[in-house]
Every structure is written in C-alpha cells, then in structure tokens.
C-alpha cells in the first residue's frame, strides 16, 4: 500500500487491474486503518480515472452477493450523495412514486455518511427490516413494485471500510461507486452525481454497457434534479442542458429543499411528501426526478413521465406502494 500511496500522491494512476486488486485488498482487511483512510482521501485531492473507477467497480461486483431480478425490467433511482446540500430524501421518495406508477424499482441504498440521513436511515426509522435474501427482494417487488437492497447486506466484504468512512464523515470514491454496484444489475438506471466530471465518467462507462440510463447533475452542485437551476442530462441518446421551465416547473430556492437536521426530520418530510401534503417545491422536485425515471424505462418524453408521476402521487398510489412495501418488509 505504501508504494500505491506514493504513486497516487505523485499524480500517477492505477491500471484497471491494479485498482481492482487494491479494493480487493481493502475488503479482505489486508491494510491497516491509517492506510485505508489515506487511500480514500487521495481521491479527494485528485481526479479518479475511468480505468480506476472501472477497476473499483469490478472488485465490488465480483465480491457482492448478486440478486437475480431478470424479468422485472427494474430501475434504480439514486444519487452518489456527497454534494453537501443536505436536501430531503428526494431519490427515496421519488422511488416510491415511480413504484406507484407500476414501474419496478430495485433501489440500492445505505446509511448517510456525509449527510444527515441516507435512504437506509429513513426507511429503518419507518419500521423497515432490511434483508439480504434475494427471494425477499422478489416478494417485495411483487407486492409493491419496489425492493430495497441495504448495501452492507449485499457487499459484506466492505465491512472493514464502513467504520472508516463513517469516521471520516466526508465523501469518498465509494460515493462514486454506489450507484454502479447495485447487486441486482438493473437494466435501467437514473443516477444523480455530485460533479460534472463524474457525470461524464459515468456516461463513458455506461455507454459501454447494455444499460438504459439517465445521468443528471445540477450545475449548482446537486446530485439530482434540484430545479434550483439548469441541470446536465446525459443519456443513451443525448447530452443536453435542461431548465426547470422546460419541465413545467419554476426555479426553486435552495432553502426550499432543506432536509432538516436529524433522521426524525427527514422521516417526517418523507411521510408528508409521500402523502401528497408536501410544499409546492417539494412536490415539484420529486415529480421531476420520478418523471425522468419513468420516462427512462418507458422511453417516453420526460413531460409524459412527469404526468404519470403526478398521477401516482396525487391518487395515493405512491403511498399505497410504500404501505405494501412496509407490510412486506417489516
């Protein structure tokens, strides 16, 4: 590890195979905590390369417990996190709106590391019991059109790294990796990323797969469609800038997306918004993200996807999906 760290600090890069080997070593406990922490922080000081990201992804997927969800044509709706914006759980709420529109969601999530509350924090506080059983994921999808894969249960080899990430409390390349290592390998993906550079890296990697994808990055730094300004959209077919007005929404202020200071705050917002009792700003932002997810799977216009998302939320079908999900996973 000393040699690897010296190379990285001197702005040298790892090959894809070297990156895979290092991450495999991290997983096996080959390195001490100081070495692991140093390795994680190097990538805050210099950009990660495509080859390094591919190697880290290869190791994570090789070490994970896979879930076979063939036939469900599911989508994962998630962000990398690490944007420092402390928004409410937009992608989690959006996922249930997508499920309420009868589009299958295979969501992969975790506890918050650099934020107050990740998707796992909110769902756990609502009574969800996490499972690492692949058959349980299928039962959940059949009952509610959504399943939730709590990352530590499907990536057990990463148990050595988790405590160090929590102690650091800052974004690391594991934030970049999270959306790429969904153990169900869903054929569709909506992913929000915290930088334009990472959006382009994701675009390059996904263009070399069979995945049907949409990658978003708000130009003011959000890892999702925030409606606080224009956002970059990269998909199989296009790379473009999109304004809130094009989607039929007004430009929002950052304060309107605040997620509170505790898990309890985040949970309350989740319940209020999913009950169609959220503010106009909260509703707009979840509908835009859910609408893009629906349109990605169905290959329709984003505005059509937003209309389906609105119907899901306003009819109560999104909340019904959550209630069925909770019943199956508690």
Predicted features and spans:
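Acidic, glycine-rich active-site loops and adjacent beta-strand->loop/helix elements
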Residues: 79-84, 109-115, 154, 219-220
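Short amphipathic alpha-helical face segments that pack within enzyme cores
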Residues: 38, 93-97, 285, 289-292
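Glycine-rich anion-binding loops and their surrounding alpha/beta cores
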Residues: 7, 59-65, 87, 102, ...
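A generic alpha-helix surface/boundary motif
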Residues: 17, 92, 117, 121, ...
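Conserved catalytic-core motifs characterized by acidic clusters
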Residues: 75, 110-111, 182
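Acidic, glycine/proline-rich low-complexity segments that act as flexible tails and inter-domain linkers
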Residues: 1-87, 101, 105, 252-257, ...
């Amino acid at each position: 590890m000393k040699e690897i760290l010296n190379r990285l600090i001197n702005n040298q890069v790892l090959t894809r195979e070297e990156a895979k080997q290092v991450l495999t070593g991290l997983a096996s406990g080959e390195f001490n905590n100081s070495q692991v922490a140093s390795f994680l922080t190097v990538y805050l000081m210099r950009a990660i390369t495509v080859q390094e990201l591919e190697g880290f992804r290869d190791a994570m997927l090789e070490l994970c417990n896979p879930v076979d969800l063939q036939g469900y044509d599911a989508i994962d709706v998630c962000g990398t996190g690490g944007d420092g914006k402390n928004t409410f759980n937009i992608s989690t709420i959006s996922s249930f709106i997508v499920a309420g529109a009868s589009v299958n969601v295979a969501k992969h999530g975790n506890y918050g590391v650099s934020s107050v509350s990740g998707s796992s924090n909110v769902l756990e506080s609502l009574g969800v019991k996490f499972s690492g059983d692949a058959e349980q994921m299928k039962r959940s999808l059949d009952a509610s059109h959504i399943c939730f894969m709590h990352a530590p249960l499907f990536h057990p080899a990463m148990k050595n790294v988790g405590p160090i990430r929590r102690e650091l409390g800052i974004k690391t390349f594991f934030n970049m990796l999270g959306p790429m290592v969904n153990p169900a390998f869903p054929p569709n993906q909506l992913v929000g990323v915290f930088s334009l550079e990472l959006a382009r890296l994701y675009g390059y990697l996904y263009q070399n797969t069979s995945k049907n994808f949409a990658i978003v990055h708000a130009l003011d730094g959000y890892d999702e469609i925030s409606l606080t300004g224009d956002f970059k959209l990269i998909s199989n077919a296009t790379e473009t800038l999109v304004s809130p007005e094009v989607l039929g929404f007004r430009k929002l202020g950052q304060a309107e997306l605040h997620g509170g200071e505790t898990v309890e705050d985040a949970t309350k917002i989740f319940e209020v918004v999913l009950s169609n009792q959220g503010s106009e700003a909260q509703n707009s932002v979840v509908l835009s993200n859910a609408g893009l997810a629906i349109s990605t799977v169905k290959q329709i216009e984003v505005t059509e996807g937003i209309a389906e998302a609105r119907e899901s939320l306003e009819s109560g079908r999104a909340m019904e999906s959550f209630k069925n999900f909770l019943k199956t996973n508690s």
